[in-house]
């Protein structure tokens, strides 16, 4: 179930809660973990202005952004990369609104999940280029699964080149993360590998046009004091999954 109140969006599955907040034109992940109550009395505790974005030379700066793009002001792997017609590659997507929408209607262009119970639509717009970005998070009945994807609408009067458009971004605070991957080769696929990620980036990808037996898109992340999280794709194609761990004990999964 999805609930909207004040500048928050609360996304509940059977046993988990994802709590998002908007502020300063951004959307931030406030909480993701075991299911929490609908009591809103705790919200003033976390209802504050978020940090301004500084330059990439400030290694101590970081924030729990739910969507990021080139030009955010930090040195972390981002979710969206768009090249504009004039060859510039900085985007300034600003949050517009939260809406609960119906996305169970036919969606024939791409593979997609079915029987969604509710879907949150997060809309952003780049006021310089006038490009619109929409982020969708869906929940399912009696399940802890979240479905997520991004959609770019070229509402500008110029051509754009989409370099990167990842499906999900989650930030966690921990001194170290562990990434479990399923790697291999033909007839020897899905071997379990465990990667300790600290002050570095761990990434798998396929550029062959299909998911491939080299790196399965299903990955598991173990985050200190948070537990285990996993992700997978609903299609076979090129993919990339990565987790970046910083010196400041922040971890970003894309």
Question: Which positions does each model-derived feature cover?
Answer:
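Basic/polar N-terminal segments that are highly enriched at the extreme N-terminus
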Residues: 1-4
């Amino acid at each position: 179930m999805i609930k909207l109140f004040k500048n928050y969006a609360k996304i509940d599955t059977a046993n988990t809660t994802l709590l998002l907040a908007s502020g300063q034109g951004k959307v931030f992940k406030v909480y993701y973990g075991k299911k929490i109550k609908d009591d809103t009395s705790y919200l003033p505790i976390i209802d504050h202005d978020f940090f301004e974005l500084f330059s990439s030379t400030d290694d101590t700066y970081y924030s729990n952004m739910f969507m990021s793009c080139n030009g955010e002001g930090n040195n972390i792997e981002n979710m969206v990369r768009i090249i504009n017609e004039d060859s510039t590659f900085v985007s300034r997507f600003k949050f517009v609104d939260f809406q609960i929408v119906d996305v169970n209607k036919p969606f024939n262009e791409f593979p997609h999940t079915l029987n969604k119970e509710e879907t949150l639509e997060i809309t952003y717009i780049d006021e310089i280029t006038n490009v619109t970005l929409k982020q969708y998070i869906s929940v399912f009945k009696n399940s802890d699964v979240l479905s997520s994807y991004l959609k770019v609408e070229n509402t500008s009067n110029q051509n754009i080149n989409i370099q990167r458009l990842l499906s999900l971004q989650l930030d966690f605070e921990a001194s170290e993360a562990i990434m479990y991957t399923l790697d291999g080769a033909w007839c020897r696929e899905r071997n379990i590998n465990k990667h300790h990620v600290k002050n570095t980036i761990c990434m798998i990808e396929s550029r062959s046009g299909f998911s491939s037996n080299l790196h399965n898109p299903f990955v598991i992340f173990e985050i200190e004091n948070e537990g285990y999280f996993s992700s997978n794709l609903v299609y076979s194609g090129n993919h990339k999954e990565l987790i970046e761990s910083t010196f400041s004990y922040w971890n970003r999964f894309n």
